[in-house]
């Protein structure tokens, strides 16, 4: 069974954990391994499921992940089931600061190629979701960005 967001799953947040990056609000909490977990309003509704021990614990992640096609490190992984609920996640490893692999691009065409940070990607997705730009009759339905995990 896949869990869908509902208003009864929203937990109250103390104001000192709420932050804003590039126009996107996040609840910033420390993960069990000492890293940082930034949850969007979509992610806060799944707070318990998104704790890293429920999807990124090394044995669980290694056993349950499926690599998705593409040039970057993107995986599908289910969360562990909690109280009869689970989520199917798409996990993308950040490649900011890495060199672009030349095997996938020609140097001449993509000389100045860079990777977006997760903050930039989430801001762009939220901008598309809001429909603030472009024709008002066109809505772009995207996946709901849940959160950004920064390892210790």
Model-derived segments and their meaning:
Residues 2-65:
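Juxta-kinase regulatory segment immediately upstream of eukaryotic protein kinase catalytic domains
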Residues 47-152:
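Conserved ATP-binding subdomain of kinase catalytic cores across diverse folds
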């Amino acid at each position: 069974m896949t869990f869908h967001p509902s208003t009864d799953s929203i937990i109250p947040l103390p104001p000192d954990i709420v932050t804003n990056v590039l126009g996107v609000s996040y609840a910033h909490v420390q993960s069990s391994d000492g890293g940082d977990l930034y949850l969007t309003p979509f992610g806060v509704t799944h707070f318990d499921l998104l704790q890293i021990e429920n999807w990124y614990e090394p044995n669980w992640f290694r056993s349950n992940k499926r690599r998705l096609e593409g040039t970057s490190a993107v995986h599908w992984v289910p969360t562990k089931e909690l109280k009869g609920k689970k989520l199917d996640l798409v996990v993308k490893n950040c490649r900011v600061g890495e060199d672009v692999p030349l095997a996938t691009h020609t140097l001449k065409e993509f000389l100045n190629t860079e990777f977006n940070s997760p903050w930039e990607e989430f801001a762009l997705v939220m901008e598309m979701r809001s429909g603030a730009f472009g024709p008002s009759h066109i809505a772009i339905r995207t996946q709901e960005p849940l959160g950004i995990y920064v390892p210790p």
